[in-house]
């Protein structure tokens, strides 16, 4: 049985993950085609810079983690509470990946992708609260309380 909150959260997580992937791809293309190394570095190309390489690796891990959590949330056949917690984790991981991509894109290229509108979305900090209260105190998410 589906729950509207779970469906909404899965859609939000999928959108953020898609935007994060697109942003990473834009960043990679920019770095490969237009990026310039720092003037005082010992590299000929920005794509050889260990700092840049590490940043890209970090982003890829965040995106892969978000994708795995989203897939788990989409396929989980558990109680509504388990499914809602899984979708909350996917929302958090996807938002984290998107924000990290946006920050690194700005840091390395000077550009920013336009982030999705937050209108109609629950504040991200609220998802941490729901997840933490569930893990720490065993409290069911408020969306499931009657």
Residue ranges with predicted function:
Residues 24-38, 67-74, 101-105:
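Extended amphipathic alpha-helical scaffold segments
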Residues 31, 38, 59, 81, ...:
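Short alpha-helical interface elements
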Residues 1-15, 102-146:
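Glycine-rich phosphate/cofactor-binding loops in nucleotide/flavin-utilizing enzymes
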Residues 1-61:
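Glycine-rich beta->alpha junctions and the first turn(s) of the following alpha-helix
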């Amino acid at each position: 049985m589906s729950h509207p909150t779970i469906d909404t959260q899965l859609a939000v997580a999928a959108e953020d993950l898609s935007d994060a992937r697109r942003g990473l791809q834009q960043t990679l293309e920019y770095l490969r085609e237009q990026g310039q190394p720092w003037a005082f570095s010992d590299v000929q190309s920005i794509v050889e810079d260990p700092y840049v390489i590490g940043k890209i690796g970090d982003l890829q891990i965040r995106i892969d983690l978000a994708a795995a959590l989203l897939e788990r949330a989409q396929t989980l056949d558990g109680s509504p509470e388990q499914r809602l917690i899984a979708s909350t984790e996917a929302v958090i991981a996807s938002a984290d990946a998107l924000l990290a991509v946006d920050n690194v894109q700005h840091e390395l290229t000077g550009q920013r992708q336009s982030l999705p509108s937050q209108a109609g979305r629950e504040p991200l900090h609220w998802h941490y609260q729901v997840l933490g209260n569930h893990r720490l105190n065993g409290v069911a998410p408020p969306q499931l309380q009657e």
